[in-house]
Amino acid sequence: MPPRLLELAGAFGLQVHRISVRNQRWRWGSCSRTGHICLNWRLVQMPASVRDYVLTHELMHLKQMDHSPKFWALVARACPDYEAARQWLRGYARNPQGTPATS
């Protein structure tokens, strides 16, 4: 994951200062104001498109720290299919032992 994060950061003209991968229970990732991005190790189990969305989401926090409309506009520009990835994550959260639950 860190190599892909750095690849995406370069494509977006962003600089990540530190990357860590952890066993997080409630978050897929986080980004600090100092450029430290922390990722959940479980991302490796997810489809590449979902993983890329999470990485992109965290990278966009380097431009906009909150989840304001401006932030979501940045995410939408960088990852046009982000809604599908968010839906997948919601399904995974309901059924983490297997494939996402469908409604």
Where are these regions (language model features)?
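Walker B catalytic acidic pair
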Residues: 58
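Active-site-proximal or metal-binding-adjacent scaffold patches in catalytic folds
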Residues: 1-53, 62-103
